[in-house]
Curated annotation (Swiss-Prot):
It is a multi-pass membrane protein. Keywords: Amino-acid transport, Membrane, Transmembrane, Transmembrane helix, Transport. Disulfide bonds: none annotated. This is L-cystine uptake protein TcyP. Pfam families: SDF. Mediates uptake of L-cystine, the oxidized form of L-cysteine. GO terms for cellular component: plasma membrane. GO terms for molecular function: L-cystine transmembrane transporter activity; symporter activity.
């Protein structure tokens, strides 16, 4: 009987995937297909929750197979992320429109990312205070305590490292190692290495233009090939979203979520407030927040379901271009946003945990000097946070260890981590796109016609198949 039910569950997922494929062939909007996949995954996951326990053999076996589609899609994206960061930064330097204002553009992007992260930290502090969250209120089961102990063991060296030592760790000693994504700070390592190559290209272009032209041709060719691979992978987005959402909802522990409901509610309240601030920033520059939401929906939906900012990078860059951002700035903003100034994972989350832990070590979390110190530490620690699953935990440990706070609390939230991480990741991606749009607007390079054109969306022929 279990085998029949397992096959039935898998067959229904494949049937919905078949419907999505049929809609693709009929050139149904990419956004609509992603939204349908998201909704279908949630509804189907809830139905499975109603009929089966999350830890039942039927769910475990069927979701293992469904996971091939979901995790397989995310792995394809992760496969291309490091090459895409590398070639995107290099190609940004080879584009004249960017190199003319390189210093100003870099400063604006980084400044926007860090400033919004500081604002996000303040919102996280406020959310923890308003909802009166405290570490002692978090229930600690066997799994949570075990995970907390594992975190303390895994990051023992990081706890001992000072903030300056943690900053030094951002500098790549072996760029080829970072291209494999082995270090937690590999993304920023690749960004730094690529930037050095880009600056070197600018110098060679002045003294040896022929050599620079050869290099530019190679970079442009590689960029075209990498982006073609990206396009092929992005066509799989609706199917990946369907599988990921089905598995996430079907295997979630609803009882644990209800037990920690106040923390979940506070987290999403903070995330929503910060997203509204993103829209206010755009409105303040004379741009329509509604247009932004409509065009950004596919990439935000993917980031929400997949929980990987790095995996969303290809769609992030494409979406910025559809919002009128020059390709060079889009590459910079998207790549920098992977490892610097993540509003959700590196801003709101560490701030909330720090405020919750502070009373247990005798620190008043509402003391102005502590709040200011916390915001500064979070802003600095936001450099180098990985754009893949686990980035928020890494960011929280960086902040807590810098404040000399215990880090085990991060393990106590394991049961609701996937649910909260979805919203955090979507906010991360939104923050990087807003930094690109804001920078383009300030430098006068934003194409307002493209931004306002409803036909300029991710629903391109490339996405249709």
């Amino acid at each position: 009987m279990d085998l029949f039910l397992t096959l039935l569950i898998i067959a229904i997922v494949l049937a919905v995937a078949g419907l999505l494929f049929y809609m693709q062939k009929k050139h149904v909007s990419f956004s609509i297909r992603v939204l349908l996949a998201l909704g279908a995954g949630v509804v189907y996951g809830l139905l499975l929750q109603f009929f089966f326990a999350p830890d039942s053999s039927v769910i475990q076996q069927s979701m293992d197979w469904v996971n091939i589609l979901g995790t397989g899609y995310v792995r394809f994206l992760q496969m291309i992320v490091m090459p895409l960061i590398f070639i995107s930064i290099l190609s940004a330097f080879t584009r004249m429109t960017l190199t003319k204002n390189l210093g100003k553009i870099s400063a604006l992007i980084l400044g926007t990312l860090i400033a919004t992260t500081a604002i996000a930290a303040a919102i996280g502090i406020t959310a923890s205070s308003v909802f009166q969250l405290e570490a002692i209120d978090i229930p600690a089961g066997e799994a949570e305590l075990s995970h907390g102990d594992a975190l303390e063991e895994s990051y023992a060296g990081m706890e001992a490292a000072t903030l300056p030592q943690q900053i030094v760790e951002l500098i790549p000693a072996n760029p080829f190692l970072d291209l494999t994504g082995e270090r937690p700070t590999s993304a920023i390592g690749v960004v730094i290495f690529s930037a050095f190559l880009g600056v070197a290209y600018l110098g060679v272009r002045r003294k040896q233009p022929e050599a620079a032209d050869t290099f530019k041709g190679i970079v442009n060719a590689l960029y075209a090939i990498i982006m073609r691979v990206v396009t092929l992978i992005l066509r799989l987005t609706p199917y990946g979203v369907l599988a990921i959402m089905t598995r996430t909802v079907a295997t979630s522990d609803l009882q644990a979520i209800s037990t920690l409901g106040t923390f979940v509610l506070a987290s999403y309240a903070a995330l929503i407030v910060m997203f509204v601030i993103h829209l206010i920033i755009l409105a303040a520059t004379g741009l329509s927040p509604i247009t932004y939401v409509k065009k950004a929906f596919p990439v935000l939906a993917f980031a929400f379901t997949s929980r990987t900012s790095a995996g969303a990078l290809p769609m992030n860059i494409q979406t910025q271009k559809k919002l009128g951002v020059p390709e060079g700035i889009a590459n910079f903003a998207g790549s920098f946003g992977l490892s610097i100034g993540q509003n959700g994972c590196a801003g709101i989350y560490p701030a909330m945990l720090a405020v919750m832990i502070a009373p247990t070590v005798g620190q008043n979390p509402l003391e102005p000097t502590f709040i200011l110190l916390l915001i500064v530490v979070i802003a600095i620690s936001s450099f180098g946070v990985a754009g893949v699953g686990g980035g928020a935990t890494f960011a929280a440990i960086l902040v807590l260890s810098a404040l000399d706070f215990p880090i085990a609390l991060a393990g106590l939230l394991i049961s609701i981590e996937p649910l909260i991480d979805m919203g955090r990741t979507a906010l991360n991606v939104s923050g990087s796109m807003v930094s690109g749009i804001f920078t383009s607007k300030v430098t006068g390079s934003l194409d307002k016609e493209v931004f306002s054109d409803p036909n300029e969306q991710l629903d391109t022929q490339d996405m249709q198949g």
